[in-house]
Curated annotation (Swiss-Prot):
Pfam families: TMP-TENI (PF02581)
Native organism: Salinispora tropica (strain ATCC BAA-916 / DSM 44818 / JCM 13857 / NBRC 105044 / CNB-440)
Name of the protein described by the UniProt record: Thiamine-phosphate synthase
Annotated Mg(2+) binding sites: D71, D90
The keyword tRNA-binding belongs to this UniProt entry's keyword annotation: no
Lineage: Bacteria, Bacillati, Actinomycetota, Actinomycetes, Micromonosporales
Family to which this protein belongs: Belongs to the thiamine-phosphate synthase family.
Disulfide links within the chain: none
GO cellular component terms given for this protein: cytoplasm
Amino acid sequence: MSSLGRLHLITDARAGRNPLTVVQAALSVARTELVVQVRVADDATDRQAYDLARRVIALCARYDATCLVNDRLHVALAVGAAGGHVGADDLPVGAARAVLGSAAVLGVTARDADTAVEAVAAGASYLGVGPVHPTTSKEGLPPAIGVAGVGVVAAAVSVPVIAIGAVTAADVPVLRAAGAYGVAVIGALSHAADPAGATAALLEALTW
């Protein structure tokens, strides 16, 4: 998947800022290099997820950027997203691939080489690998695997590895050197005073 954008933005409604504002700011800078992953709180309704995803899809379409929906694959299908992303507690990878179809983008969370290899064999298009650093963006995460952990996974698979977990622009060079194709961020953009400027800094680091 060489055409996959290197910068992934995961939406965050907890930041006190409209996630659509952050998405628009990031898209205006990153354009096709941005992949927006629509993620809502566990207690959000499917209707809420659908409404947000539909609006994000409309924004992404203006820039020919990719939009995925995390966890709720039925919502991804309903809004016509490019695909989805599943974690350890979601549908098995093979089942997710069957739901989305062979042409869809399917991201899968993996934290070790064995899980990564199995995910790719079952149909993963790319892997979200981490957390690189301790993070509070999601409850119940395992300990951070660090840059070295990302490197172990990247060496084991041929699909793009997207590093995640409190990643900042300063982390990008060492993550890329370890084998990461790109990075996924939440707070680095959602909490930024200037999301467009923060996007530019991340892109500059990613395209060395």
